[in-house]
Amino acid sequence: MAATDNRKVVEGVHKMTPSEAFVETCVANGVSEMFGIMGSAFMDAMDIFAPAGIRLIPVVHEQGAAHMADGYARVSGRHGVVIGQNGPGISNCVTGIAAAYWAHSPVVIVTPETGTMGMGLGGFQEANQLPMFQEFTKYQGHVCNPKRMAEFTGRVFDRAMSEMGPTQLNIPRDYFYGEIECEIPKPMRVDRGHGGEASLQAAVELLKTAKFPVILAGGGVVMGDAVEEAKQLAERLGAPVATGYLRNDAFPAKHPLWAGPLGYQGSKAAMKLIAQADVVIALGSRMGPFGTLPQHGMDYWPKAAKIIQIEADHTNLGLVKKIAVGINGDAKAVAAELSRRLADVTLGCDATKAARADTIATEKAAWEKELDGWTHERDPYSLDMIEEAKGERTPTGGSYLHPRQVLRELEKAMPARVMVSTDIGNINSVANSYLRFDEPRSFFAPMSFGNCGYALPTIIGAKCAAPDRPAIAYAGDGAWGMSMMEIMTAVRHDIPVTAVVFHNRQWGAEKKNQVDFYNRRFVAGELESESFSDIAKAMGAEGIVVDHIEDVGPALQKAIDMQMKEGKTCVIEIMCTRELGDPFRRDALSKPVRMLDKYKDYV
């Protein structure tokens, strides 16, 4: 087949091998990249990836492959695909698929399995792979007969899109071989529409009388390409728009109605504004419990407000918060329909649009001023750590920097159209105060699963999907150690990215719990003194150490120039003090109580 025809899928019924049926169905669904590590279990199919126009990007560890598929899917809006060797290669993917599940990311994991004649005998690399993923997939397809290869392959791609989450295709390794006769199925995509008439009209009636409506824009706005429709609805209502926790790209920060993110270390402006709401439109948001916890000393969620929840997944309607109206529909279509119905209606909030606009601007300005002056943490432990750092010098002779000051400087230096992924951890989560975006599909985090090692592989996958956009990963030194080897993937396969490593020599998020609940009794929290810049250089990347605050912005700009102009990956190692932001979960811990005498001092 000529190179120009390799993406043309055969039509009608043909004789082919199951491997060919699998590959052709992948091509029919637009697959051009897969992530994984080569293996004998799928080698027959892998052999024809290249002539089909599919690039297999080899990784260092399969968890990284799953995260890369997640990042790829979240940027492109298409499937991200991960594949690996049966048994350990597949079990290594579980954490990455779990993170994709909580991000509602259309990742397809292809899991070749032990051959049918060896199942149940405890053979080499044998594992029961379907139970591994049953909690973290929307659909699991098991190829029970090679003649059904195309059918099941097509279905997992369809269901990943229609159900907005990962799906699994499990294939006994001997089922790639043989001769079958089949037709390659065409992709099926669901048109969700704008919801039911009764729920739409109920929402309109609530909005007619609302005095202070607020929109909470969630992941459904991003995944549904609904930002423009969200803007139109917000402008019609004069409503401030808060974004959901770790959904900072769901509304453009340059828009005057943008208020910032809710959740841990989110925007005080957004919290103060939503606290005034009498009607909240949760647009594509499940209003997750962690993302609406009290923050900055404010229990801000408006408990008396009427909530209109718009969700493509009906099982999320009213799941977390009591709602007045639930609309099961596409965020884009629902927002557009509400705007249409409200266009010529006099609303109770129309008369106060100008006053509310002033309130929004005032709250945002106050928050920005506070961030400018909030150069360091102010709790007693952090103040002790700041004092301690005054007598220390970094290995390169500089100073340890305040994380908040660093994050502000990074924010100022962000290039246009940037994509950012953040790992879990104390400094990375404080970054929620500072990260803002002007286009969707720009921000990626491990969401409710909260696993370490997420940021670097995810941004590599994102960069594969959008090579023309700057790509930056944020990680603390603890989380960085879990996936920094994927720098080799970026270097080997010419996928240039920039990583910022906050080197504060500790597992900060958990250590903060030991500060607040365990009287500073530190166990297993210290991480001493690797040179991540030197490690990056050993892996073939560039490395920069920053230990002067005035160098933060220029270092990022230099690394981005290397990425975009020279195709180079760079690790920026920023030396930070040991000060710590608030704990994630004050609600989840208690002061210790001891009953036995030998532990009586451990309170």
UniProtKB/Swiss-Prot annotation:
Cofactor(s) in the UniProt record: Mg(2+); thiamine diphosphate
One term under GO cellular component: acetolactate synthase complex
EC numbers for this chain: 2.3.3.15
Gene Ontology MF terms: acetolactate synthase activity; flavin adenine dinucleotide binding; magnesium ion binding; sulfoacetaldehyde acetyltransferase activity; thiamine pyrophosphate binding
Chief localization: cytoplasm
Subcellular location: Cytoplasm
Protein keywords: Acyltransferase, Cytoplasm, Magnesium, Metal-binding, Thiamine pyrophosphate, Transferase
Gene3D superfamilies documented for this protein: 3.40.50.970, TPP-binding domain
The keyword Transferase is annotated on this UniProt entry: yes
InterPro entries referenced in this protein's UniProt entry, alphabetically: DHS-like_NAD/FAD-binding_dom (IPR029035), Sulphoacetald_Actrfrase (IPR017820), THDP-binding (IPR029061), Thiamin_PyroP_enz_cen_dom (IPR012000), Thiamin_PyroP_enz_TPP-bd_dom (IPR012001), TPP_enz (IPR045229), TPP_enzyme_TPP-bd (IPR011766)
Coiled coil: none
SUPFAM superfamilies in the record: DHS-like NAD/FAD-binding domain (SSF52467), Thiamin diphosphate-binding fold (THDP-binding) (SSF52518)
Pathway: Organosulfur degradation; taurine degradation via aerobic pathway; acetyl phosphate and sulfite from taurine: step 2/2
An example Gene Ontology biological process: taurine catabolic process
The organism's place on the tree of life at top rank: Bacteria
Reactions catalysed, as given in the entry: acetyl phosphate + sulfite + H(+) = sulfoacetaldehyde + phosphate
Keyword Transmembrane helix among record annotations: no
PANTHER family to which the protein is assigned, alphabetical: ACETOLACTATE SYNTHASE CATALYTIC SUBUNIT, MITOCHONDRIAL, THIAMINE PYROPHOSPHATE ENZYMES
NCBIfam families: PRK07525.1, sulphoacet_xsc
Family: Belongs to the TPP enzyme family.
Subunit structure as annotated in this protein's UniProt entry: Homodimer or homotetramer.
Protein name: Sulfoacetaldehyde acetyltransferase
Species, as recorded: Alcaligenes xylosoxydans xylosoxydans
Higher taxonomy: Bacteria, Pseudomonadati, Pseudomonadota, Betaproteobacteria, Burkholderiales
Gene: xsc
